[in-house]
Structures are given as structure tokens and as C-alpha cells.
From Swiss-Prot:
Record remark: domains: The cysteine framework is XI (C-C-CC-CC-C-C).
Reported modifications of this chain: Contains 4 disulfide bonds.
Location of this chain's protein in the cell: Secreted
Organism for this UniProt entry: Iotyrris olangoensis
Protein name from the UniProt record: Turripeptide Lol11.1
Domain of life: Eukaryota
GO MF annotation list: potassium channel regulator activity; toxin activity
Length: 83
């Protein structure tokens, strides 16, 4: 029984140590996240970017959304062309 408890304790210790080592491998400073697994591997995403499809980009660009300014201009254009 003591041998099993020692084995479980060692496994838990190994998992904890590996979990603590993960941030060491991130080469990006501060709050920047590391992203990419291709030619740009290890690219650091800035504060306004995040990792999307293994590349640093903005939320808008990643999800193909439209910002409020573009939407407003398109509505104004539509209103001008319908009169």
C-alpha cells in the first residue's frame, strides 16, 4: 500500500512540475501570447491581437465581422441610392 501511495505521489509531483514549467517556454514578454506553428512559429501577439487559426490577428479580422463605421457608411449609401 505504501508503495502505491509513493507512486501516486511521484506522479502528482511530476504533473505539478510540468505544469509549472509551461510558462518558462513562452518567449513572449509580459501579457503577450505566443502563437503559430508554421513559418511564424513563436510570433508574439500584441495586446489588441490574439491567436486565431495559428496566426496573430484582431477579433474583427479573424471572424470576418464588420465594424460600426463600415456598417454606418453602407447604410447611408443604401439610403442615398434608394431615394
Amino acid at each position: 500500500m505504501a508503495r502505491q501511495m509513493m507512486t501516486v505521489g511521484c506522479l502528482i509531483l511530476i504533473v505539478v512540475l510540468l505544469d509549472m514549467m509551461v510558462p518558462v517556454f513562452n518567449t513572449c514578454p509580459g501579457q503577450y501570447d505566443e502563437c503559430g506553428n508554421g513559418p511564424e512559429e513563436g510570433e508574439c501577439c500584441g495586446t489588441h491581437n490574439y491567436c486565431c487559426k495559428n496566426a496573430c490577428t484582431t477579433y474583427h479580422h479573424c471572424h470576418g465581422g464588420r465594424d460600426a463605421g463600415k456598417l454606418l457608411r453602407s447604410l447611408k449609401k443604401l439610403k442615398l441610392t434608394t431615394h
